[in-house]
Amino acid sequence: MFKIVDKQQLTPLIYSLWVEAPRIAQSAKPGQFLIVRPSDNGERVPLTICDYNPDNGTVRIVVQIAGVSSNKICNLNVGDCLTDVAGPLGKPSDFMEIPEEELKGKRYLFVAGGVGAAPVYPQAKYLHERGAKVDVIIGARNKDLIIMEDEMRKVCSNLYICTDDGSKGEKGVVTLLMERLGNKYDMCVAIGPMIMMKFATLMAKKLELPITVSLNTLMVDGTGMCGACRVSVAGKTMFACVDGPEFNGYDVDFDEALRRQTLYRKEEQQANAAAGLEFKR
């Protein structure tokens, strides 16, 4: 069992949990994720590792209530336990293969959409600590969905915020800020809703900027056996859980990935309705 040692509510629907998981905390790297099961009869929920502390053996996950299982996780309290936490899964971020001395002075632009700020944080932190220049864009529908602003400011050179309704930061979408910042980076990394990553990739192409995206496809087992997370990358079938979750944005068939994300929309709506849950899409 994996005990929850800290819980914070970041927004009305987003929670931060620190969980005891010593083995995972010792081996976790930026870019990797976990499969979490809240109860014996609960679903397996893929969640990116937001932070990890090898010294006290804890990992941090950020969960947005979007259905029955995520609602179960967010309703647990300090002292409660998750039934299963498997990981770390997936490949670490590509920059983990670059010698640390070569990262110093490199320029990275991170583009986070909504809860995508959570997986961006450990990557920005790792690069910042090794002397890279990190700029971060966080975009969301409104100010109530902006998370981790204070923490992000500590691990980047510049933080830019935009909201669809203009309630915080600039009014508009992340691609407008990308275009304004221009091609002055060695790499762009986009993490968030699939549609946001698609248009961030199109903007990166316009700017002639290399871009990596982290795909949040459907997942079940997290080891490549079920095939639920398959995506087309450079014309080949890849599994986001073992070949990713990060891929070259230019190679991803986003339209196919977007279609696959709606495969079980009806079943999700039925399950939410049965549990008395209602969410805006």
What is each of the regions a protein language model found here?
Residues 42-51, 89-100, 241:
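Short, Lys/Arg- and Gly-enriched loop/turn segments at beta-strand edges
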Residues 71-220:
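FNR/FR-type flavoprotein reductase catalytic core
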